[in-house]
Amino acid sequence: MANVFDYPKEQLAELIAKTSAELLAAETAKDAVPVIKKALEKYTIFDLQRIGGNIRREVEVLPEPYRSRYRPYSQDLLTQYHAFLADVRSGKAATGAILDRELWDEFWGRAEESSFSEEVSKNAPEAGLGNPAGKFFYRLVYGYAMLIAGLPGHPVGMPFPGGWKVLEENGEILCPIRDKEKDLPQALCNYCPAIQDERCL
């Protein structure tokens, strides 16, 4: 089984296009979950090690004390990946309606363009930067987490420079950077169910 990170550009583009088309055709979460699972299972243990290594390197270059505060949240991408597969295997994965059809269609309609785009979000983990395979992995994991499970792209408690963090108040997830990347259409923040924490503007 070849590593997705080693796919030739044409093969990776074909995977992204085929997966995205199937997800655009999905009518419910029950339809979408097997498609996401199939695509994620193409990533080998070596791909996952590369993603994890990139995340660890990203953390180590951060200045203290922010580095120590951020480190416990830095593996959220892989945590969400493992949680998704565990939910699928146990039959607990979401099966209902897709939460926002318009957002879903936009998200997967942009998948190939965003994966191969050289523009990057300053808030994306290193795993999603520079390599289309990493960007697509990131999109698959958070496509389920945000647009089906309704989870925020950054976990509650995650700190940001300046002392701000993602908070949960009165049943709402408040994020200090939710609306700060609207000029980057491929930024996953634009699809997050969290709302902008107005105190951070």
Features from the language model and the residues they span:
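Extended, solvent-exposed polar beta/coil surface segments
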Residues: 1-8
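Cysteine-centered metal-binding/redox modules
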Residues: 14-201
